[in-house]
Amino acid sequence: MKPGSTLIRHYLQFKDFRAEEYAYLFERARIIKQRFKNYERYQPLTDRTLAMIFEKASTRTRVSFEAGMYQMGGSVVNLTTEGSQLGRAEPIEDSARVISRMVDIVMIRTFEQTKLEAFAAHSRVPVINGLTNEYH
């Protein structure tokens, strides 16, 4: 999110984007992937940090988000429920407030859609649904 911007847009389920927005994203992804294949340096995410929160373990989700951030110049903070107080000793709302002050975007892979939505409601940065029992 740009400094001074007040618009926070989350991606919590498929209906959060319109068809033309998906078309734009897929076209941008195609262009970026082609640049990568051509060894063109393209790092628009320099000095940006993604927090990945995993309540549900994953290989492909973690690798795809992490590799994408690094390839585009960003960095990643990987959090698991086993290695943090997320959802246990610390309410999800407090975690959202604190974590979102330190990163530029958050991806969450969790069991409950309501937990994802609660985090997003208290986040200062965009939140992406990495998977819930309801949406993927």
Please place each PLM-identified region on the residue numbering:
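Positively charged, low-complexity intrinsically disordered leader regions
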Residues: 1-63, 67
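Phosphate/diphosphate ligand-binding glycine-rich loop within oxidoreductases
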Residues: 44-136
